[in-house]
Regions:
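Beta-lactam-recognizing serine transpeptidase/beta-lactamase-like catalytic domain environment
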Residues: 1-179
Length: 179
């Protein structure tokens, strides 16, 4: 639910690791602001609520854990780099852009599923498509809420430079530092 309020007080300490935000957003933010402002602490707390197993299942259904089937052999072999053990810490770091590396094709398929009302469609260069049936990976309500939040990232958040007159652009930035 986009209005659920998350604890964004931090940093989150997990053993020798610290999860921080780029800016201090205060002690609490609703989920829609966690996404709009790109709060690492907020997304990590959401991942804790969901749990590592459910997150892994969702990302697998979204097509983010296996190579994407595609007509071009050069584009179809890319396999995301996944954690060896999908732990609670892995789930938290994956939530804000660490812990999982995906190809541009994976990102396109994932974002397209959100834009398509929660239906994952196999990408294709063929005019008639791949012939594969779309797969429901999230409810239409969840997809609509996700589109609204991603649109908010562009209109009110960290991706304001992505706004294009005449288009309803949605997007997501990353504020996590990668060494």
């Amino acid at each position: 639910n986009p209005t659920t309020v998350m604890n964004t007080q931090g940093p989150i300490r997990w053993g020798k690791f610290k999860i921080r935000d780029y800016h201090d957003y205060g002690a609490k933010l609703p989920v829609w602001e966690v996404i709009t402002k790109s709060s690492n602490i907020g997304t990590a707390r959401i991942a804790q609520m969901i749990g590592a197993e459910e997150q892994q299942k969702f990302l697998t259904n979204l097509g983010m854990t296996d190579p994407i089937k595609f007509e071009m052999i050069e584009a179809s072999g890319g396999k995301p780099l996944l954690p060896k053990k999908w732990s609670e810490l892995s789930a938290m770091t994956i939530s804000y852009g660490h812990g999982l590396s995906a190809t541009p094709m994976h990102l396109a398929v994932g974002y397209a599923a959100i834009a398509n009302g929660g239906l994952r469609i196999q990408p294709s260069l063929l005019k008639g498509g791949s012939g594969a049936e779309p797969v429901r990976v999230m409810s239409t309500a969840s997809a609509a809420n996700s589109v609204k939040m991603l649109r908010g990232v562009v209109t009110d958040g960290t991706a304001s430079m992505g706004e294009v007159a005449g288009y309803a652009v949605a997007g997501k930035t990353g504020t996590a530092d990668k060494p």
